[in-house]
Amino acid sequence: MQLKAKEELLRNMELGLIPDQEIRQLIRVELEKRLQWGYKETHEEQLSQLLDLVHSLKGMKMATEMENLDLKLYEAPMEFLKIQHGSNMKQSAGYYTDESTTLDEAEIAMLDLYMERAQIKDGQSVLDLGCGLGAVALFGANKFKKCQFTGVTSSVEQKDYIEGKCKELKLTNVKVLLADITTYETEERFDRIFAVELIEHMKNYQLLLKKISEWMKDDGLLFVEHVCHKTLAYHYEPVDAEDWYTNYIFPAGTLTLSSASMLLYFQDDVSVVNQWTLSGKHYSRSHEEWLKNMDKNIVEFKEIMRSITKTEKEAIKLLNFWRIFCMCGAELFGYKNGEEWMLTHLLFKKK
């Protein structure tokens, strides 16, 4: 596919000229190419590939290219996010116990699972790094009234939303700090720390975990959730010149996808207590539910897009960007029945 043809494909997708099933098939083609690129003939080669990336990350800054993250993803209108997500406004995977589980139920089930695996108990001090719209902090603070939750976000809109929800829910045990995690410093020490889908935009996990360990009490625990591939780890960069998919959502340099085992190579300042993996089917289904929510409310969705863009064409492109985002996530995490790309949970203690 020549550059001109790739640009035309993306333009037609964003204008809604390509059917969903065709887009999904194009995504699956790119996913298969990624696996062909990543899987090696011998275990020796496979391990060498992983360790090469581990060693290179240890020589990098904590995070790079953060300023290039697409604002469409991280500064989306609150009215839109309320349409897309469930009642807990969880911007990551839900936990689906069976086929009848709703999006709201899946959000609650996953948040309950976080609390259980992080061993949250009343009276603890809890830090939520990269707290997003506060799903973890708000849920935890409502369930554990004697805990004090501190959320850290770099988004003014997210901070305002969480503080508004605290007033609505009459929660006095949540505070939100506006800060960049890579430069954030505090003298406070916490019983528990959450890092849910934070490391994906980091590079040097060694520096990150060292920094986090300094905020942990001696008997504190760190709970991490991150998306992963079961074997492969790689920077999110195109496989070849024809790859339209890789940098469509995440610009080059802004995302590194870890393997399920990758953080085990970064135990200088923390040591793993436990690890779990969750089938990619959970995240795939969350993306499908988000897409359904958008399509069920398409008229309202279009009006929101029109309110933040200058032209009708830009509104259509933004609408289809979000639809394609959901299809990309659904296909990635659903690929091969959720047994390639998935989620992992890790619990660390301080060394």
Swiss-Prot record:
Keywords: Alkaloid metabolism, Cytoplasm, Methyltransferase, S-adenosyl-L-methionine, Transferase. It is found in: Cytoplasm. One of its GO terms (biological process) is response to molecule of fungal origin. It holds the Pfam family CMAS. Expressed in roots, stems, flower buds and at lower levels, in leaves. Restricted to sieve elements of the phloem adjacent or proximal to laticifers. One of its GO terms (cellular component) is cytoplasm. Its main location: cytoplasm. Induction: Up-regulated upon fungal elicitor treatment or wounding. It is an enzyme of class 2 (transferase). One of its GO terms (molecular function) is (S)-coclaurine-N-methyltransferase activity. It catalyses: (S)-coclaurine + S-adenosyl-L-methionine = (S)-N-methylcoclaurine + S-adenosyl-L-homocysteine + H(+). Signal peptide: none annotated. Its EC number is 2.1.1.140. The active site is at C326. S-adenosyl-L-methionine binds at residues 91-92, 126-134, 153-158. It comes from the Eukaryota. Pathway: Alkaloid biosynthesis; (S)-reticuline biosynthesis; (S)-reticuline from (S)-norcoclaurine: step 2/4. Belongs to the CFA/CMAS family. Involved in the biosynthesis of benzylisoquinoline alkaloids. N-methyltransferase methylating (S)-coclaurine. 4'-O-methylcoclaurine and norlaudanine can also be used as substrates. This is (S)-coclaurine N-methyltransferase. It comes from Papaver somniferum (Opium poppy). The gene is CNMT.
